[in-house]
């Protein structure tokens, strides 16, 4: 009762052949087995929030495993292998009834998929999705702000938006800028293919501008500005952080302190940069 445990059930993906022996369809049987496995590994009786990691059906965002596809492949529009949303919801209802999960949510969903799940749950008398976890940070704002903010307002669905990658996989710490310490460690150096959406795009150039803003407003570092900005969005209920050590964890927690404010002037400058770099991770250099 002292912590909230959240985990996910992954869906089909060509680059996750090792997961559940390659059978990652979000069928009822697979979802139930995945939750039992999570309960065993977590050594707990229940999960507070179970999330469906990404859609089982075809959507452009996850077709190639890197969440940055921008073209809609019409040949994949009819996906005969996708599990109906009704079947996925049936599995979630079973888990709720069994007491193995307290709430359920979505992740990397589309506005249509989120609303469809919400309506199906209402029709079936099942608890509606509590949350939808989405990619959101200074470099990636458009899909959330244009497609989900209105959908998730309290008077509409009331689904909580959880932001993941608030530091853009570490890019928004500033440690990968060329004038920073070249010996710095990080996943993007140790695993060059990790989060390739931030490599080979205009993201690095945008980061330089955000770094300069952070310094001009006397922020301790770019990380503090990036995290604090996400946390102060009125439509973001919480954010998912990641830390490799206690120093990074302390830095992340410190950013939740209200002493690191976002003034109206700073907000305007950030929005001006967003106008300049509206979707940098989708534009190749």
Curated annotation (Swiss-Prot):
One of its GO terms (molecular function) is oxidoreductase activity. This is Aldo-keto reductase. NADP(+) binds at residues 165-175. The keyword Transmembrane helix does not apply. Keywords: NADP, Oxidoreductase. Belongs to the aldo/keto reductase family. Aldo/keto reductase 2 subfamily.
């Amino acid at each position: 009762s002292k912590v909230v445990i959240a985990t996910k059930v992954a869906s089909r993906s060509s680059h996750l052949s090792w997961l559940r022996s390659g059978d990652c369809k979000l069928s009822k049987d697979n979802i139930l087995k995945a939750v039992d496995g999570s309960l065993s590994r977590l050594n707990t009786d229940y999960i507070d929030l179970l999330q469906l990691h990404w859609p089982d059906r075809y959507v452009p965002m996850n077709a190639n495993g890197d969440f940055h596809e921008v073209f809609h492949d019409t040949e994949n529009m009819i996906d005969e292998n996708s599990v109906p949303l009704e079947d996925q919801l049936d599995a979630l209802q079973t888990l709720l009834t069994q007491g193995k999960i307290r709430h359920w949510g979505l992740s990397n969903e589309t506005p249509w998929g989120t609303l469809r799940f919400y309506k199906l749950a209402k029709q079936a008398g099942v608890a509606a999705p509590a949350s939808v976890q989405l990619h959101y940070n200074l470099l990636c704002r458009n899909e959330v702000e244009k497609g989900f903010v209105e959908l998730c307002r309290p008077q509409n669905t009331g689904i909580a938006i959880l932001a993941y990658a608030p530091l853009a996989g570490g890019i928004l710490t500033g440690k990968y800028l060329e004038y920073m310490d070249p010996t710095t460690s990080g996943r993007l150096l140790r695993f060059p293919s990790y989060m390739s959406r931030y490599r080979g795009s205009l993201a690095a150039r945008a980061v330089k501008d955000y770094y300069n803003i952070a310094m001009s407003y006397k922020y301790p570092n770019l990380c503090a500005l990036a995290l604090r900005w996400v946390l102060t969005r009125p439509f973001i209920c919480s954010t998912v952080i990641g830390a490799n050590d206690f120093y990074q964890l302390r830095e992340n927690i410190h950013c939740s302190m209200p002493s690191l404010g976002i003034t109206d002037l700073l907000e305007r400058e950030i929005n001006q940069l967003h106008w300049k770099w509206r979707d940098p991770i989708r534009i190749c250099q």
